[in-house]
Amino acid sequence: MTDNRGVKIIRPKAYVVSILFSFTIIRGIVLSYTNFGPNAESISENMTSQKLVILNFDDGRESQFLNAKPVLDKYGFKATFYIVCNYVENKPGFMDWKQIRELYDEGNDIGSHSMNHAHLSKLSKKEIKFEVGESKKCLEDHGIRVTSFAFPFNEGSNSKEVINSVSKYYDLARTAGSPVTYLHCDGWKNQSSQKDCRTFTKNEDLTFANRYSIRGWSHDMSRIANAYTDDDLLKRFINVVNTQTEYNKGEAIKAIPIVIYHRAGDNAPNYNTDIALFKREMSYLHDNNFQVITMRDLGYEQQGDYLYVKSTEDLSATGG
């Protein structure tokens, strides 16, 4: 089975034998035999020499396509773009379907950001189902495979009712509030004592961290909250993407930073990243050998209840 990049989709517990014939000699013949059951974590172990980062763009603004995409393309980076379905071709300043499809066809990941960017925690059960489920159908009706959801306003990941709806339609969901996400959901010592990513406790209580509350760092909120200049924000960005080195020391990949952007160089006063700054940030990632991946490059191991990074043969792009 393949996705829009034409690469193999690897599922947990499936034994895969892959033979790649290459006439470049550089790659030669690669034989991979991988068990994604109990040994799924070994995929992350094989990537310890890599510094990883996931780039997210929320809302589907046209400036992301017009201004950020050329910078991503320069370095071969791919990102996850979260689309508000009813904004497409209905609100000025947002992408149209042709632009979204171009992103997808070029190997970027497209996720759902609801139908109307609603406050999910304030909605009825029926309204939640519409915002969450119909938005996936909307994207699929345009030929786009969707696996993840991003919470509008970062609200709803602590609601059992919202999570019950999200989990019916998506493999993963993302909120904000942390420089890194911990693949075993065990790094938030002040908020939780959990050691895995199960969604509910034995008492059916919603856990603090799980695959439907993957945490990212909001680049724009960080600027607003701290009144950062571009130079300040660049320093903070560098600090955030390198935070993983505290946890990924010669063992399995345990933590990955997820950077969340909104507007991209459209001169708005809030939630905007100047393109000059964005270029400096992407240049930093490239020059320091970061591997840029997307949300769909994360898998979930059901038996062990943890997230993992899929095989390097299936990642979106290294940007090397």
Regions found by a protein language model. Name each.
Residues 2-20:
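N-terminal Sec-pathway targeting helices
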Residues 64-67, 72, 91, 119-236:
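Catalytic domains of cell-wall/extracellular-matrix polysaccharide-remodeling enzymes
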